Amino acid sequence: MPDWDKIFKEKGYVFVDPHPDISRLASLFHTHGVRRILDLGCGTGRHLAFLTQEGFEVSGFDSSSTALELAMKWLQEEELSADVHLGRMEEPFPYPDGFFDAVVSIQVIHHNMMNNILATIREIERVLKIGGYIFITVPFFGPKPEKLEDDWNLYQVEEGTFIPQSGPESGIPHHYFTEEELVEVFRNFKILEMHTDDTNHQCVLAVREY
């Protein structure tokens, strides 16, 4: 299995600044009475810290114990607190049905095979209340041709899914969504907006309808 602990031990705080949309989302969440937020794939805590500072009750969930240790250190240094859990996103989340008002997941859920991505989305739906928000970012449209032969040496394992054979994320699946695919996998949500961010990821803001 991919070794996220190894990546975080080598690179430490891989991301520090929050995603550009998070500040705007925090305002939206406050306006609509969002209180509990799940940061799925929270990594070293950049959104845990920001959203906690904004006054939300935030839970972080990640598969890397090293990342969670760094996240807790960050929170302690900022004199903040958040609930964190270690686990794999394709397995049942440690939260009851309808527990969260919102789920954010930045550059995370695409790191899997499609059957596991669908399992993750089912769990997101389960722990999110009806009327709750999701904000998800994923790569889309497929890798550029040069990515197939550069230092990543991508190998296609199923439709839309590639695994780097070398480089820092060697062995980690990367699923590239199409817009139609995103609409289908989030069919139980009303999509409010879709746009491309400055890292060339597709951002999906949606509300759970069913």
Question: Where do the protein language model's features map onto the residues?
Answer:
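Class I (Rossmann-like) S-adenosyl-L-methionine-dependent methyltransferase catalytic domain
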Residues: 1-34, 43-92, 119, 133-210
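Class I SAM-dependent methyltransferase core
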Residues: 39
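A short acidic, Gly/Pro-enriched loop at the edge of an enzyme's catalytic core
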Residues: 90-102
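A short beta-strand submotif of the Rossmann-like class I SAM-dependent methyltransferase core
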Residues: 105-108
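A short His-aromatic
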Residues: 110-112
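Conserved catalytic-core motifs of eukaryotic protein kinase domains, centered on the activation segment
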Residues: 114-116
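A short glycine-rich, Lys/Arg-flanked "PGG" loop and its adjoining helix->strand segment in the class I
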Residues: 118-130
